[in-house]
Amino acid sequence: MKSESFRKQALSLVLFFAAVAAVFALTHLRSDPAKKQAEFVVQQLLSCSSAVEQAVDAAVPAGSEPGLSAADTDGLYAFLQAQLGDAVTANCLDKVMANRLPTRITALAGQSGDKLVPADLTLKKRAGAENCYDFSATLLTATDSTAAAQVSGTITMVKEDGRWKAAAITLNL
């Protein structure tokens, strides 16, 4: 009798651990590290903090308007590189600078008269495109959470040096 009771307990224990392992496996499959990293990058780019404004202001000559003058982008590039770290490829950072994404977002903040904070950020995997996500968010003013703009775009992730990094970013304002 004892051996049969032991077998039932052992079988129950094995089934329990198999169920726990299955739950962990399913949870791991559901988690998408590329998407999490993409969300971080988009959040950082859309956040118009005072540090971003200062870096943009330092890059643009006094009296010029965003997008119309040559800017000293070295300081802004160094700032973004420090802010995003290993989250973007060097080529992607070059494209972000060439497309003036930080200055476009800062210009929106200037128009609203307040710092902007992204809210309701959603990322959705693009059908048929591996590691490409469509995103959308509302940019709210920091003071009273008034909607200042609706933004959308895409972000494509690649695995480089064992880490997920943004390879391309588009932004529609």
Locations of regions flagged by a protein language model:
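Core segments of small alpha/beta cavity-forming domains
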Residues: P33-G110
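Gram-positive cell-envelope targeting signals
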Residues: M1-L45
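Generic alpha-helical hydrophobic packing signal
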Residues: A38-V42, L139, A166
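Short amphipathic alpha-helical segments, especially helix-boundary/capping motifs
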Residues: V20, V56-V60, E130-N131
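Surface-exposed, charged secondary-structure patches
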Residues: T103-S145
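Short beta-strand edge/turn micro-motifs at domain boundaries
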Residues: A148-L173
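Short, Lys/Arg-enriched charge-dense amphipathic segments
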Residues: T73-V88, V117-R126, L140, N172
